[in-house]
Amino acid sequence: MSESSPALGPASGAALGPAPRAAGGAETVAVARFLNATRAEGPGERTAVWVQGCAIRCPGCFNPHLWSFRGGERVAPADLVRRVLDAGTEGLTLLGGEPFDQAAPLATVAAGVRAAGRSVMTFTGYTRAQLDRAVDAGRDDVAALLATTDLLVAGPFLADRLDTRRPWVGSTNQEFVLLGDRFPDLLDAVSRSPDRVEVTVDAAGGIAVNGWAEADALDELLASVARPQPRRASFERR
């Protein structure tokens, strides 16, 4: 998909974003961020993968830097499955960006993760109706990712319909959809799980935030984290 392609928008009734690649083409996932373990992106301890690229581009999106289809680390599905399983968590959460704009390779990843007995949770800005229409129109890649997802969170973010009562969602229109009965406890966990925010500071001082919080609270948190702090030298006698 080129950068000049129009955004579909949260209210668009248009078809889904990028179509499957030509047969025989090498499929990779454009990964913007890989987080080994988190308790802020779904029930239990999960590995989270944010993909690069989104055709929806909801106003007020928390991750506008992930809209562009340029960038990200290109990772083969088999390598991504191995990284997820090596993390040793309860399952995989797919976010973005828009996972269904990379449905074909992500379906391969999800299938590999589920084959190892782990659960898959997928966030999408498309509505369930849009996904169903895409499947009816012959989008086998979309059907495959739906078939390998245990818990779907569907619907665009709507800034004028903020949801502060349910975990993991940003607006009241977004819905939890349990796909199949393999992991029925996932949906039950929604009512028992609080919103969380996790802040990671790397060795170079870079700050990464994931999870869910109201904008004002998040701004205050980031300001406090970014504020220079006095340093105290420490050492250990041997």
Language-model region placement:
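N-terminal [4Fe-4S]-dependent radical SAM core
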Residues: 1-50, 59, 63-69, 196-198
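A cross-domain feature marking catalytic cores of carbohydrate-active enzymes
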Residues: 51, 96, 122-124, 201, ...
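Flexible glycine/acidic-rich beta-alpha junction loops that bind and position SAM and/or redox cofactors
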Residues: 71, 131-132, 156-170
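Short secondary-structure boundary segments
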Residues: 124-125, 155-157
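Receiver (REC) domain switch/active-site residues of two-component response regulators
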Residues: 150
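Radical SAM enzyme core and accessory elements
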Residues: 3-16, 206-238
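P-loop/Walker A phosphate-binding loop and immediately adjacent motor/lid segment at beta-alpha junctions
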Residues: 102-114, 162-205
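Conserved Radical SAM active-site core
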Residues: 27-36, 45-46, 62-144
